[in-house]
Amino acid sequence: QFSKAWSLAIIKSDNLEEMKICANTVNGLINFEMDLHIKLCKKYGISKKNLINAEERNKNIAYSRYVLESGYSGDFLDLITPLIPCVIGYAEIGNNLKNYKPSNQMYKSWIQTYSGEEYQKISKSVGRLFDSAILSRLGKNFYKTRKWKSIQKKFKTAVLLEIDFWEMALE
């Protein structure tokens, strides 16, 4: 679902640079991140077919549909705002865990992917995209606009939905 949202961001983009960043993000999600998850699942006995056909959990539906609906009903900022906590969050978690040496190597490849240079580069690029989109659409005094309050609310909601998404693993 997040690949679809980033694909929609290409359409909602105002310029070629935004389109490139969104397209690179889609490429990273589909051609690298999905491969990681498929390999991890296979390693632990979950086939690609079972993974692809798995029933989507309610918390995942809530988060991903919130993002998509934000994009369908709003503009570029409305769409990318709820995407940011996921991208930046994974980069931060990966970075914080990169020197962690657990006795159980179950998550080693996950940590290497999200702390790795490629994902960190994507994360920084997405952060710059967000900053640039805010300035180009709302101006230097963005924090005084009505839209800024909406962006803050969307971001906070997305963070809470991202937390719920992570908590699914504990259920």
What do the PLM-derived regions correspond to, one by one?
Residues 145, 149-171:
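Acidic, carboxylate-rich catalytic segments that either coordinate divalent cations
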Residues 19-125, 156, 160:
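Active-site-proximal alpha-helical scaffolds that flank and shape metal-associated catalytic sites
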Residues 8, 12-16, 43-47, 100, ...:
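Surface-exposed helix-capping loop/turn segments at secondary-structure junctions
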